[in-house]
Design a protein with these regions (language model features):
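Helix-loop-beta hinge of the Bergerat
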Residues: 2-31
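Short, structured helix-loop boundary elements
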Residues: 13-14, 34, 38, 58, ...
């Protein structure tokens, strides 16, 4: 199990994603699995680094990665409470010009992962994703 801690996180999205993808758990996956995990992790990281904390706050992001018969990645931040799973799903039947901005990344995340869970515990957002591998 890999435990990663990042602080500060502002402007560090690429470094955070690279560290996750280079973890022994993720790096040992098949290329197709890595690409799906990359998409999911990138969406979560961008949301946390862009929106979780006020502009002048450093903030932190903890990431726990565990590989068994499934990959489990747990993201924990101390930002404002935000459950991405409660957001309105985008209307994918509309053309992109008519579709409202936002929500497509989380929509894709939910479609690509086998399980996505959110909890707010002890003033922390905890988002866990799982993918059978």
């Amino acid at each position: 199990m890999s435990k990663l801690h990042f602080q500060p996180i502002k402007g560090q999205a690429r470094e955070i994603l690279t560290a996750i993808l280079e973890s022994p758990e993720v790096a040992s996956c098949k290329e197709e699995e890595i690409q799906v995990l990359r998409l999911a992790c990138e969406e979560i990281i961008m949301n946390v680094t862009s929106y979780a904390y006020p502009e002048d706050a450093d903030g932190f992001l903890d990431v726990d990665i565990q590989k068994t018969d499934r990959m489990t990645i747990r993201f924990e931040d101390g930002g404002a409470p935000f459950n991405p799973l409660e957001q309105e799903k985008p209307d994918t039947g509309l053309s992109w010009e008519k579709r409202r901005i936002g929500g497509l990344g989380i929509f894709l995340l939910r479609r690509k992962m086998d399980d996505v869970r959110y909890a707010y515990v002890d003033h922390k957002n905890i988002l866990t994703i799982e993918k059978k591998i």
